[in-house]
Amino acid sequence: MTKAQFYIEGMTCSACSSGIERALGRKKFVQEVGVDLISKKAFVVYDENQASLEDVFKQIEKLGYQPRVATDTPNTFLNPSFLTPNVKLALVLLGTLGVLALSMFAPLLPLPSFLKNPFINGIVQLVLSLMVMHMGRNFYVHGFKALWARQPNMDSLIALGTSAALLYSLVLLFRAYTHAPIEGYYFESVCVILLFVMAGKRVEENSKDKALEAMQSLMRHQSLNALKIENGQSVEVPLESLQKGDILQILPGSYIPVDGVLFKGEAEVDESMLSGESLPVYKKEGMDLFAGTLNTTTTFQMRATHTKAQSTLAKILTLIAKAQGSKAPIARLADKVAGVFVPIVIGIASIAFLVWLVLGDFTRALEVFIAILVISCPCALGLATPMALLVAQKEASLLGLFFKDAVSLEKAKNVNHVIFDKTGTLTLGTPLVQEVRVAEGVDRLELLTLCASLEAQSEHVIAKGIVAHAKEQGIALQEVQEVQAKPGFGIKGVVGDQIIKAGNLEFFNLPNPFGTLEGIQVFVGTETQILGVVVLADSLKEGSKEAISELKALGVKTTLLSGDNLENVRALATQLGIQDYHAQAKPEDKLKVIQELKAQGKVVMMVGDGVNDAPSLALSDVGVVMAKGSDASLEVADVVSFNNDIQSVVSAMKLSALTIANIKQNLFWAFCYNSIAIPLACGVAYKLGIMFNPMLASLAMSLSSVSVVLNAQRLRGAHFKIRGSHENRHSS
């Protein structure tokens, strides 16, 4: 099976996207298909032995749409000609005003005498109407092709309604040519309908572009070239050629090309595209740098630790591509309704036409037929969910969050139990030296020098904490010979003229001269004597305590699961106010806890970052991973916190609740609108003097979809509200 991603031009409503999905889904060579109306992206999983991508494209073209091979952005295939959407809309407006001047407003205007001739007046209206229809020709091309393929959409409704008005106007024009009396033409209905529909579409497209802007801007953070240091000189090279270990020069105002560490110098880096925080982050030698972030101040050198394809930015862009093709359950329901909506509307319009025709009023029958086709709005149904989800994804990015699919964004609001891993999630994951104790007669700095010199030979996280502390103290490390590491116990080597060991108490097999100590203990000594002990502790992440408090306030239960020893886990749980905790938990133990909670009917969120968290993240209802997590955990998680902030858990739940509430408002409005508008267009309130003519119907339809789009925009600024709620709670 082969998976292909591409763009589809010409879709206007969810009936279009769902129609493409149904048409392709019926083909034997297609295993899976997904089409996103907003981003215009599509993917197809097909059997390459039975068909090619060209065959897939032919099926789409039969429906009246134009597939395009995927590039960096869906906007690259837009027509760059003079007839831009805004120019088309302006020409439609001018043409419509001309037709209205010749029809509805003719008695009020000083028109030339020859235009008062019904036939000549009709010919001029026809010419102007044909120009307007040409500007909106996509409605007819897509609409009639979709109708012919038995996948009618909103374009089909517009095409049928305006074509009926045009054909009847041509009949009236012929009657005017024969000097038969006529009451008027329907050219103004054709033009006004197209004007309102196209104006509504422009508002929708502008809103979509704004919502997509935050995602597409990430593309602009990806450099094409980098300055590589070769033989002491900086040489510009393609980004794809960079390898791990390459030394790069970063100039002020340039984007960091790949992930790495600061090698020489210092800098302030704008990491807002990852964390959502606007203030630059100070960086010194040895600190992490991320692709796509911006160097705001000085020139410095960095060492690449990842290639372009492995960078954090590349992972984000991959996640975005996957997320844009996903649909939430609530969106699938709306798509199903929209898929059958158009055929039902055509049926209702046809029945209403026949009823009014039987009543002996052909003109009224035609107006009702056109009004029903035009007033019905599958767009409102189709846009209700994807627009809200798209705006929510943008707001999530401003919170340093990314939802990998629409399903997780919908689920997060229902979470009622959160399980936390300890190291790297609630804590920094980098043990820091808390105290150094020495035996009688031993110098503290000398002991720290011996320990750090030895630990510098190890890549263990505890060793790094000790070495970092020694460097902060200004200690110069000594050379170590004959280094031997014993996993699970410690390390030893020759420093100067003596054998020095550093590790746990079992490594020495000697009594502990310092008594009970809390934290991670690294004993230092010779083969026969313990000279001292370095005590380390993993520091609590900023905001961890506040996040747990907020979850409690929301009525969400919390559990701490860790592979650490009972003493450390209990101490952390007590500090955070978590009553349910499990120590020395293996990956299978974590799975068991999640299974038990789910069996009790709990909606479980797992928050972690390590390789051993990957199975738990996959099993939970919503898996949240810190961005510095392993590739395995990033792959299976549902939500990624790129700012490594534990409060992202609360933010994800709050944003989910706001988004689903907005979607429900949109769907409620869309269903109510269609439930009321269609019967009124049928003429059920005719006796009360309420009747929609085609022009009013088109205005109502356009306002319906525009109102849904504008309501979705109310989610903009949600990140301010969520951040504000955190700050207000912490200050109180």
From Swiss-Prot:
Swiss-Prot/TrEMBL catalytic activity: Cu(+)(in) + ATP + H2O = Cu(+)(out) + ADP + phosphate + H(+)
GO molecular function, one term: P-type divalent copper transporter activity
Active site annotation, chain numbering: 421 (4-aspartylphosphate intermediate)
Keyword Translocase: yes
Keywords: ATP-binding, Cell membrane, Copper, Copper transport, Ion transport, Magnesium, Membrane, Metal-binding, Nucleotide-binding, Phosphoprotein, Translocase, Transmembrane, Transmembrane helix, Transport
Subcellular location: Cell membrane
Residue stretches making up the HMA domain: 2-68
One of the GO BP terms on file: copper ion homeostasis
Keyword Nucleotide-binding: yes
UniProt binding sites for Mg(2+): 609, 613
Topology relative to the membrane: Multi-pass membrane protein
Xref: InterPro entries: ATPase_P-typ_cyto_dom_N, ATPase_P-typ_P_site, ATPase_P-typ_TM_dom_sf, ATPase_P-typ_transduc_dom_A_sf, HAD-like_sf, HAD_sf, Heavy-metal-associated_CS, HMA_dom
Pfam families: E1-E2_ATPase, HMA, Hydrolase
Cysteine disulfide links: none
Enzyme Commission no: 7.2.2.8
Protein residues bound to Cu(+): 13, 16
PROSITE patterns given in the database record: ATPASE_E1_E2, HMA_1, HMA_2
Transmembrane segment boundaries: 89-109, 123-142, 150-170, 188-208, 337-359, 366-383, 664-683, 695-713
Chain ranges on the Cytoplasmic side, renumbered to this chain: 1-88, 143-149, 209-336, 384-663, 714-732
Function: Probably involved in copper export.
Entries under PANTHER family matching the protein: ATP7, ISOFORM B, P-TYPE CU(+) TRANSPORTER
Family per record: Belongs to the cation transport ATPase (P-type) (TC 3.A.3) family. Type IB subfamily.
Protein name: Copper-transporting ATPase
Species for this entry: Helicobacter felis (strain ATCC 49179 / CCUG 28539 / NCTC 12436 / CS1)
Upper taxonomic lineage: Bacteria, Pseudomonadati, Campylobacterota, Epsilonproteobacteria, Campylobacterales
Gene from which this protein is expressed: copA
